[in-house]
């Protein structure tokens, strides 16, 4: 629950079409394997093969005992934490959507989202604590807000019990050209929030005081 360990379980039925054009990592030559095109050789098994030949190689076959302990400990409160993450994120997204300084908000729980029907179908209990938005002031406004928050921590992590903020265009993606940033979905104004478990009114107040400094 504190973002200190990440882990998961992969289940692959082996019947997904990876050649749809949306997954170039399976249909283009792999530099790490002498130009091998995974889908050409393995078809639907391309995904699980990539997990084994790259994930297993880079991350190892088993997590450490301490990380396993942290995951088990976190699972004890996962359900109640996810409900709070989702409730806070939806409330914050609705507040941002109505804010005069905000140009756009991307959160699938919003009724205005083009993904809302899918979100309700596949994520009926809540749509997570991750959301993104952009300010009308563009790049400079986004960077200022990320720098000026007090309750939100400025880090590239996500999924923590505490709220996190980042302005990708000036941090994680700053080495990319504007065209490369755009190809990854990063716009100059984009601010990503990982909404934590704090009182949502405190989170709104923190963002507002940062907006006021733009």
Question: Which ranges hold each PLM region?
Answer:
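Active-site C-terminal subdomain of aminotransferase-like
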Residues: 1-130, 134-161
């Amino acid at each position: 629950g504190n973002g200190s360990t990440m882990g998961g379980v992969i289940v692959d039925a082996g019947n997904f079409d990876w050649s749809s054009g949306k997954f170039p990592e399976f249909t283009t030559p792999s530099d790490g394997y002498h130009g091998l095109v995974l889908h050409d050789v393995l078809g639907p098994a391309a995904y699980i093969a990539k997990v084994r030949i790259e994930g297993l190689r880079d991350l190892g076959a088993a997590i450490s005992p301490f990380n396993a302990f942290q995951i088990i400990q976190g699972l004890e409160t996962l359900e109640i934490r996810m409900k709070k993450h989702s409730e806070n994120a939806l409330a914050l997204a609705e507040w941002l959507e109505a804010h005069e300084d905000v140009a756009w908000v991307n959160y699938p729980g919003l009724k205005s989202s083009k993904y809302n029907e899918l979100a309700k179908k596949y994520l009926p209990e809540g749509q997570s604590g991750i959301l993104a938005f952009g300010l009308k002031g563009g790049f400079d406004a986004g960077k200022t807000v990320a720098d000026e928050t007090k309750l939100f921590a400025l880090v590239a992590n996500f999924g923590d019990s505490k709220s996190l903020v980042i302005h990708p265009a000036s941090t994680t993606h700053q080495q990319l050209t504007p065209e490369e940033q755009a190809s990854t979905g990063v716009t100059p104004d984009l601010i990503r929030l990982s909404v934590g478990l704090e009182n949502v009114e405190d989170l709104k107040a923190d963002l507002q005081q940062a907006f006021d400094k733009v």
